[in-house]
Amino acid sequence: MPKTKAGDHFESLFEYAPISLWEQDYSGIKSFLDKLRASGVANLDTFLNEHPEEIDKTLRLIKVTHVNRETLNLFGAKTEKELLANLDKMFRDEMRAHWRSELTALWNGEFNWSGDGVNYRLDGEALDIRLHWRILPECESTWECVLVAIENITALKQAEKRFRNLFKY
């Protein structure tokens, strides 16, 4: 199907946005959480305390459908294929607590979330990030289309640390 002029415009807005943007599919996470509810799980926090390995399992259920150019730049990838092949290097360690908070929001029926965390570039450099996601209105029943924005706040966090250190002594 040929693209419309408006479609080209919105694709360019996504592709050239000056912030890391991701299109993701959380339908696998929705199925996982729905099955937990159906099995009688009433409290996700209690369940995750008893089964912490499930946090990693749900991370693997995220499907990344597209990222923009700034995402490649931020994470040091040359291509989307390279980036997607290395997600386990980028989202690790401190990310689990961050993701747990996101899972809790999803469990509680929230369609958008924001929070700070740590991701890693492909070269291993840590990035302090502010992550925002929104399940798009047309996908609120399936969670198949989620827009994710990642802002690099490393310089801000370093400045905050220097500021706090000024007043320690």
Feature locations, PLM:
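N-terminal capping loop/helix in small sensory signaling domains highlighted by a polar->aromatic N-x2-3-F motif
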Residues: D25, D34, V41-L44, N68-T71
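Short loop/turn elements at sensory-signaling interfaces that couple input to output
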Residues: L122-A126, L131-V146
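PAS-family sensory/regulatory domains
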Residues: R69, N73-F75, K81-E94
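Conserved hydrophobic beta-strand signature of PAS-family and PAS-like sensory domains
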Residues: K30-S31, R37, D45-L48, L61-T65
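PAS-associated C-terminal
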Residues: Q24, V148-E151
